[in-house]
From Swiss-Prot:
Gene3D superfamilies: Zinc/RING finger domain, C3HC4 (zinc finger). It is found in: Nucleus; Cytoplasm; Nucleus, PML body. This is E3 ubiquitin-protein ligase Arkadia. The gene is RNF111. A zinc finger (RING-type) spans 942-983. It comes from Homo sapiens. Broadly expressed. Keywords: Cytoplasm, Developmental protein, DNA damage, DNA repair, Isopeptide bond, Metal-binding, Nucleus, Transferase, Ubl conjugation, Ubl conjugation pathway, Zinc, Zinc-finger. Residues 174-184, 234-247, 508-522 have a biased composition (Basic residues). Zn(2+) binds at C942, C945, H965, C968.
Amino acid sequence: MSQWTPEYNELYTLKVDMKSEIPSDAPKTQESLKGILLHPEPIGAAKSFPAGVEMINSKVGNEFSHLCDDSQKQEKEMNGNQQEQEKSLVVRKKRKSQQAGPSYVQNCVKENQGILGLRQHLGTPSDEDNDSSFSDCLSSPSSSLHFGDSDTVTSDEDKEVSVRHSQTILNAKSRSHSARSHKWPRTETESVSGLLMKRPCLHGSSLRRLPCRKRFVKNNSSQRTQKQKERILMQRKKREVLARRKYALLPSSSSSSENDLSSESSSSSSTEGEEDLFVSASENHQNNPAVPSGSIDEDVVVIEASSTPQVTANEEINVTSTDSEVEIVTVGESYRSRSTLGHSRSHWSQGSSSHASRPQEPRNRSRISTVIQPLRQNAAEVVDLTVDEDEPTVVPTTSARMESQATSASINNSNPSTSEQASDTASAVTSSQPSTVSETSATLTSNSTTGTSIGDDSRRTTSSAVTETGPPAMPRLPSCCPQHSPCGGSSQNHHALGHPHTSCFQQHGHHFQHHHHHHHTPHPAVPVSPSFSDPACPVERPPQVQAPCGANSSSGTSYHEQQALPVDLSNSGIRSHGSGSFHGASAFDPCCPVSSSRAAIFGHQAAAAAPSQPLSSIDGYGSSMVAQPQPQPPPQPSLSSCRHYMPPPYASLTRPLHHQASACPHSHGNPPPQTQPPPQVDYVIPHPVHAFHSQISSHATSHPVAPPPPTHLASTAAPIPQHLPPTHQPISHHIPATAPPAQRLHPHEVMQRMEVQRRRMMQHPTRAHERPPPHPHRMHPNYGHGHHIHVPQTMSSHPRQAPERSAWELGIEAGVTAATYTPGALHPHLAHYHAPPRLHHLQLGALPLMVPDMAGYPHIRYISSGLDGTSFRGPFRGNFEELIHLEERLGNVNRGASQGTIERCTYPHKYKKVTTDWFSQRKLHCKQDGEEGTEEDTEEKCTICLSILEEGEDVRRLPCMHLFHQVCVDQWLITNKKCPICRVDIEAQLPSES
């Protein structure tokens, strides 16, 4: 920050002022900001925003209020606007206090409208006026916590104007929100853009910029005044330095955004003081381009896109989200005019390192779409604070772009950013991939300036290039969210994300301009949705997604902010879904292993929040996707999470979310089918990615069709296919890298399916075994064979069931590891048992899973292990047969005597009470003893039947002299030739008896 000139400090002060709560002062703040912004050339005049834009501005202001903190640095860049911005900043301060949430957004809407009116009044033809409108927007919307909270301005002109004002106001408010969350220092002047950047909603951008708040200088020239132009030139140089610093700080920046979620997440929060205004500017620029008319999400900031290229890179909209607050600084005209699409994206990319770090060209539109999905008009520039220009993800995309366009200014800024970013690698995801990000960022910037198509090619290139650089980004992701740690690769995929996103960018890049569409138009619906750009898919982007979103913001700032500020992250992840956010989402998506692997597009799609964000990312809503995921976390499988494979925490959640998100906000331009199909395809990274990418491309191409969240999917299926191949190709490269995540997720799904099938199978087979005909078989002499047959029956009885079998086989066919199963694979013995489903699976690889369950059933275990037929008979059958034979031998030994032996060894006779005399004698003896004997004493009992032996009954006396009924003892001796009483063998006594 020491680098910042006093002007920057002043701007920072203004930023602080703007951060101040301005509930009802929004109009005044707008006027103040207007005054400040009026000094610059009439961006507002060049682009008047309709009432819709004003509403968007309000929302944007609210959403960006958190970024406003970071935007302060960018405000510094807006030194030209300092004077007017100071006024506006005062209002912003007030607004910051106000930023409470959606209600503030509503206030911001009104304030934005007021600002819009002020802006229209002030509406000097200077681009700076637009900036000042933007500042006003920041101030006015600032009153609302969420950028998109304020009502969306209906008319496009109003939207643009309002967007400007709303962005400014919202920046202030968002900034306050961020300040609250992050408490980042605002002593230094922050441009409105810086304010926007502060907003966590501008997660992607602010995340990027937050790390490099010092880069705020780049965004300094929001006003297009002569002084500011000079300042812009000077600041461009500063930006280069700051870009390095920014990229070094980038992690911090993103952390600052994510500070809302968790300051500890990343150093980025520590960068609060730095206030990554650059990120904001770049982000804003991306967002500004092609702001489609329509309702703005709370996180959407509309910045008039001035066709005049007066503003240099410095004049980007400075959006910084340091304390989870977004500050929107007026978008530099330079970026606006530069943007080939009339979007600031290119210029933003060029304009600031942060912009460079955040590929803005095609993304600019997507950024805009991120910021002001509803504001479809190109005139209105939407600043997506969600996307951090410093976002590594975005940067990766930019890398290729930058390579193609090689805008020296952007590259220079970006490279310095890279150095700084590298420094902050640990701080945030971006920090992890700072160099790459800065490089890609520069590339992106250049591409933005040069053109979307070039940007696309570059992006494609970047996709692959960024993929490698992606890994560095991962650290940042982890810092912001452990979920993303699993996606360390994914985080690197941030770059990868950037890549896929880059491809996405490539697709979207071109289309992003149009694409700005703001598929996020629905997002306004979910102003508070945590870092969900898609209001339509707020649920789809769970907070967990937010965490992923942070990662998704290439800058990590975006990711962090999203984490820190769900609502703010909304812009950041989804709204920002500028290249940066998009990449971040994909890469960061914990749930999207794929997303983490540069299937950025695909990745996010697969990754958490992948559904919504994949489109977003594909739409160039890197942040959006990031924000959507969330399946961060856990990681889930970012976006998996895990998004496609999101089956992981974020993965499973993300997957649905991702799809929904795609369907909802991001798929605006895409056919709903693609969005919907991805849920399953999510994990089929290639196809879902294509679907999502195509959708995104479609969005980019048909962003104008910013249909409601529901329709956004159907918007442009055809364009998507075209871009799909390119996007897919990049994703293909990345999918290889992503492949592990993709397969990881896919394998997860496969494993899950297999597990389910296995459990079903095991339940039935287990029950069958529990029934245990098999075990009874053991007793059978032919137990081995019977068992063999029986097991197949038990195993196959259930497998034979058509439903189960179809399910199991379907699971296998779907890609389960057992997919290799074929009926022929079954052992010949088992073939006839229809064990096909179960046994096949056991044999094919499901078997290992089943074996533990079957451990209790040796026959099953042996069959499983011996499905090949070799061991089935050998160990299993042989052992049982031996046991059976042994039993038989033992049984024969213990079986008892034959009837002849019994007759020969025993003495059968008719029972006679021969002992009467003895009894009588005893009786007499007993009497003598005084004891009375009873006949019972003389009676003998058969101990087998316990009946008293009667005279004349057939009895048999054993060699041991024990007497039993013949019938009773014969039955006993047949089974056991030992005396039931004394256990003496009847034959053993023969010799002695004989």
